Amino acid sequence: FRMELVAASPDIGQPMNLAFDERGRLWVTSTLEYPYPAPLGQRGRDTIKLLEDTNGDGAYDKLTTFADGLNIPTGIYPYRDGEVAWSIPNIWFLRDTDGDGRADKREKLYGPLGFERDTHGMQSSFTRGLDGWLHLTHGFNNTTTVNAADGSSITMNSGNTYRVQLDGSSV
């Protein structure tokens, strides 16, 4: 195998997570906040960057800031016209409705969720399961109750995996 650098500072600073979509684009979370979150109610300084190969040569030649103002985005999953992403204290669906590569709509799917005790123990590893649900990890040392639109809920404390519907309807 061969290892190649595809993105680095200053374009991508302190990457936390990455994911590929069906078009081969690379989505990368970048943080300045970690490990100290921005205070609630204040805009975070973290981003999700979108890297694209626009000329088909196998190298990323376009970098777009898909979403900014985020707060330690440790989990992402490309979905439809955007990303399902964790940004303290919620799981969001960030959408690009006009096709310019930038999120212009933000819909809260789940939250607020716990993060106060330790930013190492938040929502991450967003993976679509064979069952069609989004599977996530919930790290250690935080207590989190996830409530869904249908009234279902779970409470977790330290080290869990769980699943949610991508539309916020069920957990």
Language-model region placement:
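Beta-propeller domains with acidic blade repeats across secreted/periplasmic ectodomains
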Residues: 1-171
